[in-house]
Amino acid sequence: MATSWGSILQDEKQLEELAKQAIDRALAEGVLLRSAQHPSSSDVVTYAPFTLFPSPVPSALLEQAYAVQMDFNILVDAVSQNPAFLEQTLSSTIKKDDYTARLFDIYKQVLKEGIAQTVFLGLNRSDYMFQCGADGSKALKQIEINTISASFGGLASRTPAVHRHVLNVLNKTKEASKILSNNPSKGLALGIAKAWELYGSANAVVLLIAQEKERNIFDQRAVENELLDRKIHVIRGRFEDVSERGSLDQNRRLFMDDQEVAVVYFRDGYMPSQYNSQNWEARLMLERSRAAKCPDIAIQLAGTKKVQQELSRVGLLEALLPGQPEAVARLRATFAGLYSLDMGEEGDQAIAEALAAPSHFVLKPQREGGGNNLYGEEMVQALEQLKDSEERASYILMEKIEPEPFRNCLLRPGSPAQVVQCISELGIFGVYVRQGTTLVMNKHVGHLLRTKAVEHADGGVAAGVAVLDNPYPV
């Protein structure tokens, strides 16, 4: 996938000057992170790592990813409303994965008590890579769907101007015009605003559940600012704040001090390390409340790796989406090979195949946040330890996607510009809002491209491996 600026990657002096201009433009545009040394303060900030140039993405696959996003929104919504499917699918996982089990316990408790909320909000991001066939053909294959704390919609809204600037500096104005406009933060805020409106209390606020040490605060502020522009106030709080200042009234309306909360937006709570006993109690209070949760715990469970694997089984999509054969076909076309590791013949066979050809598989736990997957020799060692243990049910196996590498220049604070062979991962942001049984909003709202050096098997921007990027349609 050649581009017209490939030769510049070999000109060290020109690259150095371009990198300076790109970094200054990124800072001016607000492509920012708090510093690693001061993650609780905005007194010292730096630019978020990014590519010097946009990266080539096949136009047809970009269009396909956008076209299927509303189907994925509907699928997540359908799964979240199907307690029998969730219980059956996660039954083996929750026996050996304490984190998923705690989430599921809260889910069951709220179901038993009766769900108070009537407005349901999904802000999802479906992530893909581009499988390269032996004949050079490219195919869109889903890596995962993120249903909680899908990040970088704010910073992704600011990077197109940076790459247009770089190409304009090179007098490549035609190429600069091909950089797609992109504003996920606006679309995410529209979903939150619709849920807030349907909640029906003009004085209620949005509660953003955040970490105390948050380097990626400007990404979150982008959504907050969009809401404030719509006269919707956002308050930030940690789980600890909910425990200390939160309460439910007799109608299960949620209050922080004396402020009623219409929507709870989680930018924390997606990893086991983010919970202690106090935080679990806070999560239960939030789930029991009438406030719209983004996500509620059913939507979070719908985004687990085990659910993703089960959805690939023959007939499952048809059962969950009856009478929608076109949507089923679009969804299934994006599925990579996914394999259960539950105890039994099917799991035994999957492990045997992975041990025989480890370069073709990835071992995935039920975790979000990046950097959790196992590849190659690490995967082999883990499977050898797990193969006779019921603990293997807390993992799934996935076919390893093999994209076509390309060259780009990675820019990171405190490091020299790095010209390397790269691969990219494309994310599409989706928003849906349901009131009762009526879907009142379902749309795609933008994209995120993250790029990393080929030698890194796993890890995103927050994990320090990937960098922000923009698709250059080819």
Curated annotation (Swiss-Prot):
Give the Phosphoserine positions (modified residues).
S415
The annotation note on the cofactor reads: Binds 1 Mg(2+) ion per subunit.
Q: Do you know which Pfam families this protein is assigned to?
A: GSH_synth_ATP, GSH_synthase
Top EC category: ligase
Which Gene Ontology molecular-function terms are recorded?
Answer: ATP binding; glutathione binding; glutathione synthase activity; magnesium ion binding; protein homodimerization activity
For this protein, the record's SUPFAM superfamilies field holds: Glutathione synthetase ATP-binding domain-like, PreATP-grasp domain
- InterPro entries, A to Z: Glutathione_synthase, Glutathione_synthase_a-hlx, Glutathione_synthase_C_euk, Glutathione_synthase_N_euk, GSH-S_sub-bd_sf, GSH_synth_subst-bd, PreATP-grasp_dom_sf
Q: Which Enzyme Commission number(s) are on file for it?
A: 6.3.2.3
UniProt-annotated binding residues for substrate: 125, 148-151, 214-216, 220, 267-270, 450, 461-462
Say if the entry is tagged with keyword Acetylation: yes
Kindly tell me the pathway this chain contributes to.
Sulfur metabolism; glutathione biosynthesis; glutathione from L-cysteine and L-glutamate: step 2/2
Q: Which reaction does it catalyse?
A: gamma-L-glutamyl-L-cysteine + glycine + ATP = glutathione + ADP + phosphate + H(+); gamma-L-glutamyl-(2S)-2-aminobutanoate + glycine + ATP = ophthalmate + ADP + phosphate + H(+)
The transmembrane residues are none
Q: Which residues does the record list as N-acetylalanine (modified residue)?
A: A2
Where along this sequence does the record place binding of Mg(2+)?
E144, N146, E368
Disulfide bridges in this chain: none
- Write out the residues that bind ATP: 144, 305, 364-373, 375, 398-401, 425, 452, 458
For the biological process aspect of GO, one term held by this record is: response to cadmium ion
Q: Which cofactor does it need?
A: Mg(2+)
Top-rank taxon: Eukaryota
Q: Which UniProt keywords apply?
A: Acetylation, ATP-binding, Glutathione biosynthesis, Ligase, Magnesium, Metal-binding, Nucleotide-binding, Phosphoprotein
User: Its quaternary structure?
Assistant: Homodimer.
What family is it from? Belongs to the eukaryotic GSH synthase family.
Known function = Catalyzes the production of glutathione from gamma-glutamylcysteine and glycine in an ATP-dependent manner. Glutathione (gamma-glutamylcysteinylglycine, GSH) is the most abundant intracellular thiol in living aerobic cells and is required for numerous processes including the protection of cells against oxidative damage, amino acid transport, the detoxification of foreign compounds, the maintenance of protein sulfhydryl groups in a reduced state and acts as a cofactor for a number of enzymes. Participates in ophthalmate biosynthesis in hepatocytes.
Q: What is this protein called?
A: Glutathione synthetase
Q: Which organism is this protein's natural source?
A: Mus musculus (Mouse)
